Amino acid sequence: MLVIHNRIEPQAEWAAELHLNFEARSKSRLRCFSAENEDVGLFLQRGQSPLRDGEFLQAEDGRIVRVCARPEKLMHVTCSSTFELTRAAYHLGNRHVALQVGDGWLRLLDDYVLKAMLDQLGATTEAIEAPFQPEHGAYGGGHHHSRAGEEDFNYPPRMHQFGVRK
């Protein structure tokens, strides 16, 4: 078994590839198979962002492994105006939906309930198959509503530096 614990900087060469959908790339513990059909065990640090397409890992035996985002069934969402697209993104965000944001479009995992909502909002949805690379979120960590154990959920901002003045 190829055992992997570490993420590393991009490399020019690699010995194996992992083709994983978004759900699998979001797990810190995973048993899967490489593209070369080798049994793989992922034991990554918990609380990190999902693996991204093109990211590199290093196995215990020193081999370099490249992560590839496997195509999956998605909804490609467009709207006739920026306002309507922003409104669609707002309603999807209220439902805590993983969302890939592009220039004039949104992508999310295929879901018939969300499709019906988007149709009611006047959005155009198209079923596609593509790698899914959703936004990780501004705070880069877990999500919770409880105040209990709040010190365990003190994630520094990743996109903004609130309260920092120049």
Swiss-Prot record:
Which Pfam families does the record match to this protein? UreE_C, UreE_N
Spans annotated as Disordered = 133-156
One GO MF annotation is: unfolded protein binding
Q: Which domain of life is it from?
A: Bacteria
Entry keyword set: Chaperone, Cytoplasm, Nickel, Nickel insertion
The subcellular location is: Cytoplasm
The name this protein carries in UniProt is Urease accessory protein UreE 2
- According to its UniProt entry, this protein's organism is Pseudomonas syringae pv. tomato (strain ATCC BAA-871 / DC3000)
Task: Report which gene this protein is encoded by.
Answer: ureE2
